[in-house]
Amino acid sequence: DRDNYPMFWGLPCIRAFHSIVPASIMEFYPEIGVTRDVASRPERSCKAIRYLFSVRYYFDEVTPDNLEPEGIDLPGFSYYDTQNGFHIYKNDYALPMGFTFDTYVSRSQWETYSESDRCNLLLRALVLEDDAVETYQKDMQKLPDAVHQMSDEDLLAECTERAKTACDSFTYNSKGFHATISTDHENLVFFSVPWEEGWSAEVNGEPVAIEKADIGFMAVPVAAGDSEITFTYHTPGLKAGALLSLGGLVLFAGYLTVAGIYNKRHPNPKTESICCVDYSTEETAN
């Protein structure tokens, strides 16, 4: 019953009771052992997604057994304040939206790891679909099979590395989002925004392909140097549907016009208009 508090507070949150979400979200969560039916409720044991999704604060409800802040089992989170019945912890390793990786893992290789290993691995390597590996393997190193397990110290070290190549700015509106980044070589910039067919992207004003990364999210290629990245979303079929609806209205208006002209030129014969009748029930004598 507390899933949607952040919606009232005006804060984006990875926890929500919401059944209308992109299909890629439904694909992603089961891959790391998280049930996703009508709500997103990742447990704290799945630590890496708090950093991957750029979570900055964690709200821990005050209960009779938790009257004083005693810390939480998320590395890098420190006590910040207590407000509105919640102990608030701040992520001192919070990542900006948009960052790069030097290492990748193919989707088929990813499937060989356990669900518990997969979650933390998301901070160490970018998961690429098998058909995208050939295109981007020249810019990134393949993850060695022996380094897929991570400790809390490893997790924070990877956060530090991701922060070094993060976007300088990130803004969003109702149509999409815009980011800037500086890189020293060609790479993919990852955004923890769910992948959908309605997205299009430009880098420095030129259209680029959007790659599906980390099972259900997006990444775009950038060249070395400064890059301005713009993502724009258009609901698939919305424009075509609007045009078809407009065309239908035009045809209907044309039909009414033609029918009106025809009726004026070919009026129906006038008939007597009868309002009502009456009759007698009395028998007529012979």
Set out the residue ranges of the language-model regions:
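Active-site-proximal, structured, solvent-exposed surfaces of multi-pass membrane proteins
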Residues: D130-Y279, E283
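Conserved luminal/periplasmic juxtamembrane motif of membrane-embedded glycan-processing enzymes
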Residues: D1-T165, N173-H178, F190, T271-Y279
